[in-house]
């Protein structure tokens, strides 16, 4: 079946189901193009919490769909591919976090939204790459912060505020593929281009950036920047949106190796099957949800 026919069927079923299609910036181009909303984790969370749709089709990875389920317990949350997980989210478990909390009993727990619902249930407040510094600054009543699971985002935040951080040894396998030599090579090839990087990158990579931004921050910055050329250091899926929204500018990936395999599992065919068969449903248990929503709600309250 060709793409236009698939899109037609998806749109018809979406209307019948009263569904909304939420798509992360790293998804393949064809999936981004059918979205009701394309964005980063923070924007997706806010859109999910505000929707009046009966069905949320989440084209991303599992923790994102879980967050939607936490925020919208009365909605049906579907993932087109049940195997679309996040390796970094899997690097920390609720059991490991509880042990860390015992070790640092005076610390507040700041969890990246890239975590399981069970980890969020053990968390004081969540953050995304777009608001991590603001969230950490909002924790006025503590000098100690446990940050899980991304050690590189934690390091970046720790350079911006004066607190005692305890890092977990987690990382994004996609962003660690971005190396200093990749940036230097691209800067040599495109000397007029500005370098914009994601805070999940290594510190030695971050040091070479003109701007350090979340994916949504990158999209906003690209529209405002006077630069006609931008070197982008994050998962390459975002290039589609950047180019679509800024047709008069040129965008170059730091490296073509920055691909998240699980983000690429979702296809138009799977979105169609998802709406036809109403699977795979992601449902966080009420016991976990009522604990986890406190941390997620606190994140959404910080502007």
Regions found by a protein language model. Name each.
Residues 1-232, 238-303:
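Active-site loop-to-helix "anion-binding N-cap" substructures in soluble metabolic enzymes
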């Amino acid at each position: 079946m060709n793409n236009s026919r698939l899109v037609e069927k998806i749109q018809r079923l979406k209307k019948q189901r009263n569904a909304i299609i939420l798509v992360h910036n790293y998804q393949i181009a064809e999936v981004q193009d059918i979205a009701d909303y394309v964005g980063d984790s923070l924007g997706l969370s806010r859109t999910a919490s505000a929707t009046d749709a009966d069905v949320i089709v989440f084209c991303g990875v599992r923790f994102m769909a879980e967050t939607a389920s936490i925020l919208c317990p009365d909605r049906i949350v579907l993932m087109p591919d049940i195997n679309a997980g996040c390796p970094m989210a899997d690097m920390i478990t609720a059991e490991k976090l509880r042990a860390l909390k015992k070790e640092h009993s005076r610390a507040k727990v700041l969890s990246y939204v890239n975590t399981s619902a069970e980890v969020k249930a053990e968390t004081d407040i969540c953050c995304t790459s777009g608001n991590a510094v603001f969230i950490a600054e909002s924790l006025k009543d503590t000098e100690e912060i446990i940050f899980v699971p991304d050690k590189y985002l934690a390091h970046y935040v720790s350079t911006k505020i004066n607190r005692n951080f305890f890092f977990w040894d987690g990382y994004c396998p996609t962003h660690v593929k971005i190396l200093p030599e990749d940036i230097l090579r691209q800067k040599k090839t495109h000397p007029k281009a500005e370098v914009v990087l994601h805070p999940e990158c290594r510190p030695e990579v971050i040091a070479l950036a003109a701007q350090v931004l979340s994916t949504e921050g990158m999209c906003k910055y690209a529209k405002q920047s006077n630069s006609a050329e931008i070197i982008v250091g994050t998962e390459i899926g975002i290039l589609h949106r950047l180019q679509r929204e800024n047709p008069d500018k040129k965008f170059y990936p730091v490296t073509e190796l920055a691909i998240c395999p699980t983000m690429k599992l979702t296809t138009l065919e799977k979105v169609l099957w998802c709406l036809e068969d109403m699977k795979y449903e992601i449902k966080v248990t009420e016991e976990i949800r009522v604990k986890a929503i406190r941390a997620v709600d606190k994140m959404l309250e910080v502007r």
